[in-house]
């Protein structure tokens, strides 16, 4: 009887052990599934983070490229504006210089026109004398010595930007640079053509300060 009890007890122990083993196995499987699920969740989360990180990097690169492009555009605009400003400044400076030069030239022109007429008349008269031909050899030789002096005076005027107006016989009358002293009849020359030059004229910077004086055919 005692042996039977022992067998029964042994069987019960085995049964309990089996149940414990099954329970432990079940718990282990459950725990393993939970870990697996957690691992997969972490993997998924990491992958999502990687995707987000990639997107952020791409977005950051795009922003950097946009900023770089904006900087380049801004620099180009600044350079363009700077060039335009420089051109405007140079234009204004040139305009001011031109105005100043025009005022100076106008002032000099008035001085030459109204203050130098006696000197220009004297130069004309002196030049006419030394350029004439004389029958007396002594007078002609004496006059030759003054021709260089006469030319030096003309060169001096040229240095002041004063140039001679020298009409020629048979030239058509140009009332912009010539002044009629006399209208001559019966000259056999075309009407309003020069028959004699009384005196040369003078210009300063292409503006007449003294008209050439001429006789013309009627």
Curated annotation (Swiss-Prot):
Record keyword Iron present: no
Localization (cell): Cytoplasm
GO cellular component, one term: cytoplasm
One GO biological process term: protein folding
Primary location: cytoplasm
Chain intervals for the UniProt region annotation (Disordered): 1-32
Pfam families reported in the protein's UniProt record: GrpE (PF01025)
Keyword Chaperone assigned: yes
Highest taxon of the lineage: Bacteria
Basic and acidic residues bias: start-end ranges: 1-13, 20-32
This protein's UniProt keywords: Chaperone, Cytoplasm, Stress response
Assembly and oligomerization: Homodimer.
Function (record text): Participates actively in the response to hyperosmotic and heat shock by preventing the aggregation of stress-denatured proteins, in association with DnaK and GrpE. It is the nucleotide exchange factor for DnaK and may function as a thermosensor. Unfolded proteins bind initially to DnaJ; upon interaction with the DnaJ-bound protein, DnaK hydrolyzes its bound ATP, resulting in the formation of a stable complex. GrpE releases ADP from DnaK; ATP binding to DnaK triggers the release of the substrate protein, thus completing the reaction cycle.
The protein's name in its UniProt record: Protein GrpE
Organism: Ureaplasma parvum serovar 3 (strain ATCC 700970)
Gene: grpE
